[in-house]
Swiss-Prot record:
The complex is composed of two ATP-binding proteins (PstB), two transmembrane proteins (PstC and PstA) and a solute-binding protein (PstS). Its EC number is 7.3.2.1. SMART domains: AAA. One of its GO terms (biological process) is phosphate ion transmembrane transport. Gene3D superfamilies: P-loop containing nucleotide triphosphate hydrolases. This is Phosphate import ATP-binding protein PstB. GO terms for cellular component: plasma membrane. It is a peripheral membrane protein.
Length: 260
């Protein structure tokens, strides 16, 4: 059972200012101004190709890996522009973690999947690593299912378990924000329900931004929702307001299924 959503804090953790993104000559994002509240779940919805996943990847500079990208404007995280020349990108990606659409566990044991990140960031003590692995798996609601087989290959897990493992792997490096790009689209309804419940529980300690094509999912788990269309935010407000009292005609048409 998914517990009732709590009201998020009013503290802004990420803010974008006139954010534009170009793929060579194509403008994929157009003047995105948005505030993300701390300890909130923000859903990004919209039709395929609207820019929501592109926007998500600007928040921890994953788009830097794509050739031909040009970005204008600011992304302010905890008071600093992440696109400034002296910003530590590795530290950024530790603080703003990412969970992808398809579960992507490393080809190694469950234990090594979780301990890999902390080791990279300097944790070598075995007792400390054991503690991180256990706590990360508990936070991702996977510990009881895998505690007796930590040294088996992670690929032996089911799809839903693999996705929770990927979430645990992200938690192990102590992020503040977790970006999720359609994390349940490849999962069955039971596994999807477990991930949704997990996301709501994680909000107590983390800020979550999730891209989803599933509007029912956005309604179930998110505090705020932004509707993207043609690289712009058409409307952004509390989830209840956007779904039940949309101000924009295009928003109403999209959520009523007139296009998608």
């Amino acid at each position: 059972m998914i517990k009732e959503k709590d009201t998020p804090k009013n503290e802004v953790i990420i803010e974008t200012e006139n954010l534009n993104l170009f793929y060579t000559d194509f403008k994929a994002l157009n003047k995105i101004n948005m505030k993300i509240l701390k300890n909130s779940i923000t859903a990004l919805i919209g039709p395929s190709g609207c820019g929501k996943s592109t926007f998500l990847r600007t928040l921890n500079r994953m788009n830097d890996l794509v050739e031909g990208i040009k970005i204008e404007g600011n992304v302010i995280y905890e008071g600093k522009n992440i696109y400034s020349n002296n910003f530590d990108i590795l530290e950024l990606r530790r603080k703003i973690g990412m969970v992808f659409q398809t579960p992507n566990p490393f080809l190694m044991s469950i234990y090594d999947n979780i301990s890999y990140g902390p080791k990279i960031h300097g944790t070598k003590d075995k007792k400390k690593l054991d503690e991180i692995v256990e706590q990360s798996l508990k936070k991702s609601a996977l510990w009881n299912e895998v505690k007796d087989k930590l040294h088996t290959n992670a690929l032996s897990l089911s799809g839903g378990q693999q996705q929770r493992l990927c979430i645990a792997r992200t938690l192990a490096i102590e992020p503040n924000v977790i970006l999720m790009d359609e994390p349940t689209s490849a999962l069955d309804p039971i596994s999807t329900g477990k991930i949704e419940e997990l996301i709501i529980n994680l909000k107590e300690s983390y800020t979550i931004i999730i891209v989803t094509h599933n509007m029912q999912q956005a309604g179930r788990i998110s505090d705020r929702t932004a509707f993207f269309l043609n690289g712009c935010i058409e409307e952004e407000s509390s989830t209840d307001e956007l779904f039940f009292n949309p101000k924009n005609t295009k928003t109403e048409e999209y959520i009523s299924g007139k296009f998608g």
